[in-house]
Amino acid sequence: MCTLEKRGDLFLLTLTGDGEHRFHPDTIATILSLLEQAKSQSTRGSILITTANGKFFSNGFDLAWAQTAGSKTGAANRLHQMVESFKPVVAALLDLPMPTIAALNGHAAAAGLILALSHDYVFMRKDRGVLYMSEVDIGLSMPDYFSALVRAKIGTSAARRELLLSGKKIRGEEAVGLGIVDSAAYDSEEGVVVASVRLGEKLAAKKWSGEVYASIRKSLYPELCGILGLETRVFATPKL
């Protein structure tokens, strides 16, 4: 399902296996638990890198599980359950006292892309993988915190339109040009992870206060943090 490995200052969160890494409630609970574990073990210089195995980073919520509820009402209730249980995952990433990097090994769609965008940096492969917000194609409305995250993280209305209102599957080079990801210069799953580790080690060497880092991060996204119920606290740990 997913694992957390500590390599010195780096925490590596991996969605394991060769499937689509759909977010079933059990998967969501496990991810949240691992983020809480990383937070509890964090020190100055800690970094989180999130990646996955196989063709997909994540293809979003487990819609097949929702549809097995046996009725439209049951399916809607299960979808609502996943939307609400995923909200604390986004909040946990914004509140995490360390820099965060998403290393996209493959396709990131819907809630899978939201997971990626919840990180400070997003790296993508150039040879494989698309970004895709499928809601307009499959007839689902956008949760408020999804929309707020996209507004917070993607700077131009043109880029947001391409991502949310066109149903377009965006490849790496275009995603960089639109300002959705930071880099897409890697030819393999290993390559994108290595690049993320390299950045992580560079950031870890700064030995920043994680609490200050998280406070500054949250101050950048007041609307999103308000929706997520996050408060920004002021920390004073100056290096004199």
Swiss-Prot record:
Enzyme class at the top of the EC tree: isomerase
Effect of a null allele: Defective in root hair expansion. Mutant plants are resistant to the inhibitory effect of intermediate levels of indole-3-butyric acid (IBA) and 2,4-DB on root elongation.
Protein name as annotated: Enoyl-CoA delta isomerase 2, peroxisomal
Biological process annotations from GO: fatty acid beta-oxidation; fatty acid catabolic process; indolebutyric acid metabolic process; response to indolebutyric acid; root hair elongation
Function: Able to isomerize both 3-cis and 3-trans double bonds into the 2-trans form in a range of enoyl-CoA species. Essential for the beta oxidation of unsaturated fatty acids. Involved with IBR1 and IBR3 in the peroxisomal beta-oxidation of indole-3-butyric acid (IBA) to form indole-3-acetic acid (IAA), a biologically active auxin.
Coiled coil: none
UniProt site positions, description: Important for catalytic activity: E135
Pfam families the record matches: ECH_1
Compartments it resides in: Peroxisome
Assigned keywords, A-Z: Fatty acid metabolism, Isomerase, Lipid metabolism, Peroxisome
CDD domains, A to Z: crotonase-like
Record PANTHER family: ENOYL-COA HYDRATASE-RELATED, ENOYL-COA HYDRATASE_ISOMERASE FAMILY PROTEIN
Similarity comment: Belongs to the enoyl-CoA hydratase/isomerase family.
Metabolic or biological pathway, per its Swiss-Prot or TrEMBL entry: Lipid metabolism; fatty acid beta-oxidation
Tree of life domain: Eukaryota
Organism: Arabidopsis thaliana
InterPro entries reported for this sequence: ClpP/crotonase-like_dom_sf, Enoyl-CoA_hydra/iso
Catalysed transformations (reactions): a (3Z)-enoyl-CoA = a 4-saturated (2E)-enoyl-CoA; a (3E)-enoyl-CoA = a 4-saturated (2E)-enoyl-CoA
